[in-house]
Amino acid sequence: MPKYRSATTTHGRNMAGARALWRATGMTDADFGKPIIAVVNSFTQFVPGHVHLRDLGKLVAEQIEAAGGVAKEFNTIAVDDGIAMGHGGMLYSLPSRELIADSVEYMVNAHCADAMVCISNCDKITPGMLMASLRLNIPVIFVSGGPMEAGKTKLSDQIIKLDLVDAMIQGADPKVSDSQSDQVERSACPTCGSCSGMFTANSMNCLTEALGLSQPGNGSLLATHADRKQLFLNAGKRIVELTKRYYEQNDESALPRNIASKAAFENAMTLDIAMGGSTNTVLHLLAAAQEAEIDFTMSDIDKLSRKVPQLCKVAPSTQKYHMEDVHRAGGVIGILGELDRAGLLNRDVKNVLGLTLPQTLEQYDVMLTQDDAVKNMFRAGPAGIRTTQAFSQDCRWDTLDDDRANGCIRSLEHAYSKDGGLAVLYGNFAENGCIVKTAGVDDSILKFTGPAKVYESQDDAVEAILGGKVVAGDVVVIRYEGPKGGPGMQEMLYPTSFLKSMGLGKACALITDGRFSGGTSGLSIGHVSPEAASGGSIGLIEDGDLIAIDIPNRGIQLQVSDAELAARREAQEARGDKAWTPKNRERQVSFALRAYASLATSADKGAVRDKSKLGG
C-alpha cells in the first residue's frame, strides 16, 4: 500500500468508524486503496467570477475517478470585491484570504486528503488557495473559472469596450447623463467570469501559469468559451498522475514547493511587471512565498522592476485591450515567450505538465509552435452574448494577434516602455517601500509634487473628492486603512475612480497605506509601509505638507525636516493608548476583524499574520 496520507483514515481496524463514514459518502472497499483528491471549489451565486463553477467541480471529479482516484469536493467562501467596494464590506476582503487559506488547510488535513485541484477565480480566492497549497505542500493543480468577456456598447456612434471601472467612473461623473450611465452599467459586465481587464483576479490567474501550477491558457481563456472545458478535464486526469508520482514513486518534483520555486516566483513577478498587473499581486506573492518558506521580498521585486520592460498593456491602463485580446495574442505564454527571448526569465523551472520553460514555449508560444490545435485554442474569442453559463460558445477570432510591434503583446524591441508596469518606491514615510502601478500613470505625472490633503478614512476622502475639496495639484493621503489600521486594508477604487470623474485623474496623486483594486489607474501609490497603525511615518503627515513623488528614480519624500518629524512622533506617542489611531473616525469593527488586526503585518510582509506573536 503506498503511503498515502488518506491511509490514516482508510486502513487499520481502529479506523472502522472512519471507514463507516466514508462508506456513507459512497466509497466502497475498492476505493480504500486509491488516493483521495480534494476538489477545492469556490462556487457562489454572489460573485460573477464564481457563479458558473457549480458543475465544474463535478466535471473534475469525474475525471479524477476515471483516472483511478477518489474525488471529494468542498467549497470555500468567495468575496466579490466589486460588490464589497465603497462600504464597510471591503474591510472583509483581504482578511478573507487568510480565512480561505485556513479553511482549505482545515478540510484537507482534517480528512487527510492526498492532493487537490483548486477551482478558483476572483481576487482573494486564488491567493488564499495558493497560500494553502504551498503551506500543505501536497500535489495540486489550479484551474480558474476564466475571465469575463469585455463589455461593449455604442456611444457617439462608436462601439467601445467597457468593464466594471467604466461603470463606476461614469456613475459618479456629473457630466454624464442618467441614460448614458445606465447604458454603461448594463453593458459593462456581460458574462460570467472574472472582470475583463488586467485586474487582480486575472493577474493572479496569469501568475499561477508562471508559477507552474496551472496549465497554459488558464489566465486568459474566456470563461464562456467551450475550449476552457478541456482545462478542467485535463486537471482531473493530471492530478492523479502527479499524486501517484509523489506517493508511489517518491517523486518530490510533483510537489508545489518544488514547482513554485524561488526561480518560478521571480518569473511570476517578472511577468506581472511586464504585463502591468494589479499591485495586489505583490501582496499575494509575498504571502505565498512565506508559506513556501521562500526568501522572496520587496527587495527582490524592486530589483526586477528596474530591469523588466512593459510588454503588454491592458485595461485599466488602456481601453483598447482586455483579457480576450491578451488571449488572442498568445496569453501568458505569449508574454513569457517575449520575456524569454529578452533573457529575462529563469529557464530551469517546470510546470504541472512536467514541461520545462523551453519545452512549454516550444509547444504553446504562438510565435514558435507548429501545433495547429494550440493556435486554434488561442483564437478562442468572445461571443458578445449575455450569459452565466460556462463553455456556452465556440466563437473564434479569424486570426491570431502575432504583431509584436504594434499588437497587444510586444517584443522587447517594441516595448510599451523600457520601465515595467509596477515599481517600488522608498522614502522618509515609506521606509519599507510602497507600490505604484506605473502602467496606469500618465507620463506627464511620473514626477509630481504637491500639498497633502490628509484623510483618516476612505469615506472622508470620497466625500472630499465629490464635494470639490480636492483640487488639481493636491496629494490625497488616506491613512489608517492598512491591514491593522483599517482593519483589512481596503481597496481605494472609489477614490481613484471619483478623481477621474471630477476631471482630476491626471492632476492629483493619491497615497495610502491601504491598497488599490486591480482596476485602479492614475498616480495611485499604495501599500505604504510601515502603515500608520504600526507607527509608520505616514501617520505624521499634516495638511499642507509638500510631498514629492519621483517614479523614474524610485523615490517618495515628505518635505519636512527630520527634527519636525521627530517632534510630531513624540506628540503622537504622548497620546498613550490612542497613539497611532485615527483621531476622528467612528467605525464599528467586529470581533472577527479585530482578531485579524491583532496579528496583521504591514503590506511589505504581504499583510500576513505575524507568527512571532503566537510563538511561531
Swiss-Prot record:
Positions of [2Fe-2S] cluster binding: C122, C195
Active site (record annotation): S517
Pfam families xref list: ILV_EDD_C, ILVD_EDD_N
Cofactors: [2Fe-2S] cluster; Mg(2+)
Positions that bind Mg(2+): D81, D123, K124, E491
Family that this chain belongs to: Belongs to the IlvD/Edd family.
Name of the protein: Dihydroxy-acid dehydratase
Gene that encodes the chain: ilvD
